[in-house]
Amino acid sequence: MRPSNRTPAQTRPITITRQFTAHAEGSVLVEFGETKVLCTASFTEGVPRFLKGQGQGWVTAEYGMLPRSTHSRMDREAARGKQSGRTQEIQRLIGRALRACVDMKALGENTIVIDCDVIQADGGTRTASITGACVALVDALNWARGKGIIKSNPLKFLIAAVSVGIYNGEAISDLEYVEDSAAETDMNVVMTETGKIIEIQGTAEGEPFSHEELIELLGLAKNSIREIVDVQKAALN
């Protein structure tokens, strides 16, 4: 039995609220149960120096957690003077995932910076960030097309992400914090809207997991991501 009484394959309630802030070209509040992340997409003309003159764009991401997004207050990383390894790993993951769904040539020499700020954390912040950031990215691209900055739609497909794991010997989807902290296996999966894999991050926290369990976890992730993409599409429509 899961602490929330969810079935093994059941995700938490997921909501996506677009245009959550006034200034960003794309702005989304994404909620996976009690995990809440603000995702903004900022569109700027021009690209980093290493891409100048190549006729293609760039998508990158930054990630952070507010001091009281967790049960006890943590210091801001800016106050500590450096980002943690975890933060760097997560923002690179978000950036890689989003670059997979954008045609950089169609984007032209323009840059989109995604900022994912965790307001409240209850497990799955990186997967929620990717899911919300994709919708914010779509809005930023539509803004640029509306302004005539880009001519064609650079978006190749929607992407979404979910955590899966083995908890009390059972494969489950969309782990909340109490499950994540006690899971025997923890995995983050990013897929396209058609179920193709973009990235898998999987670790055996206790006992090693079998090939059969891996296939079961990926099947759970695929089904959950299909449902999450439906939420994205409903928000965009």
Swiss-Prot record:
It comes from the Bacteria. GO terms for molecular function: 3'-5'-RNA exonuclease activity; tRNA binding; tRNA nucleotidyltransferase activity. InterPro entries: ExoRNase_PH_dom1, ExoRNase_PH_dom2, ExoRNase_PH_dom2_sf, PNPase/RNase_PH_dom_sf, Ribosomal_Su5_D2-typ_SF, RNase_PH, RNase_PH_bac-type, RNase_PH_CS. Phosphate binds at R86, G124, T125, R126. Gene3D superfamilies: GHMP Kinase, N-terminal domain. One of its GO terms (biological process) is rRNA processing. It catalyses: tRNA(n+1) + phosphate = tRNA(n) + a ribonucleoside 5'-diphosphate. Its EC number is 2.7.7.56. Keywords: Nucleotidyltransferase, RNA-binding, rRNA processing, Transferase, tRNA processing, tRNA-binding. The keyword NADP does not apply. Belongs to the RNase PH family. Homohexameric ring arranged as a trimer of dimers. HAMAP family: RNase_PH. Phosphorolytic 3'-5' exoribonuclease that plays an important role in tRNA 3'-end maturation. Removes nucleotide residues following the 3'-CCA terminus of tRNAs; can also add nucleotides to the ends of RNA molecules by using nucleoside diphosphates as substrates, but this may not be physiologically important. Probably plays a role in initiation of 16S rRNA degradation (leading to ribosome degradation) during starvation. This is Ribonuclease PH.
